[in-house]
Regions:
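Feature marking long nucleic-acid-engaging regions of large polymerase/nuclease enzymes
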Residues: 2-3, 7, 20-21, 27
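Acidic, turn-prone loop/beta-hairpin segments
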Residues: 12, 29-36, 43-64, 92-171
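Conserved phosphate-binding loops in nucleotide/dinucleotide-binding enzymes
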Residues: 1-10, 68-69, 73-75, 158-168
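Aromatic-lined ligand-binding clefts that engage carbohydrates, nucleic acids, or primary amines
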Residues: 80
Length: 171
């Protein structure tokens, strides 16, 4: 039971808190991914957004490669490390970019867009490991039928930026 409780505390609750942060502030601000089509195409200039999107694409590549080798442990550990970075680095440093006290801006929209994209893709990667949690978050975010009916994500190598990742590792 101790291992299960530790996993719940260190991973499931952390992921749920990231999701809760996003939906709370996005709802308060009236942000809706379906209404953001033009804004979603904007070039993202924020280094935090570039960093987490780089990490996300690296995660897609790592999880895909690990699962192709039937190494579920390596894949799950990579996801766990990513969720920790997402919570302890991206969310903590992006808190002042969102919320009702922050004026509407492209940076605010970029933060919501980035977090939305990260959570949707993360649900697809999580589906083989935590199917019910991934389904709950995915359906609440997208309104889609099921995360299990979606295509597996493909890493966009042009989004992987090792320089930004190195700089963040030094921070």
């Amino acid at each position: 039971y101790k291992k299960a409780d530790e996993t719940r505390r260190k991973f499931h609750l952390l992921l749920w808190n990231v999701y809760n942060f996003f939906i709370t502030y996005a709802n308060v601000d009236g942000w809706d991914s379906k209404m953001q089509n033009e804004k979603l195409k904007m070039k993202n200039e924020n280094v935090l957004d570039k960093w987490i999107l780089s990490k996300l694409n690296q995660l897609i590549a790592t999880v895909t490669s690990s699962l192709e080798k039937y190494d579920a442990m390596a894949a799950s550990l990579a996801i766990e490390a990513f969720v920790t970075d997402l919570s302890q680095w991206y969310i903590r440093r992006s808190r002042d970019r969102v919320g009702p006290t922050v004026d509407a801006s492209l940076d605010k929209d970029a933060c919501y867009k980035t977090l939305y994209e990260v959570l949707v893709v993360l649900c697809k990667l999580l589906a083989p490991f935590t199917p019910f949690l991934a389904e709950e978050i995915y359906r609440n975010l997208t309104g889609g039928e099921s995360v299990h009916l979606e295509s597996w994500p493909v890493a966009e190598n042009n989004m992987i930026n090792k320089d930004i990742e190195r700089q963040m590792d030094l921070a």
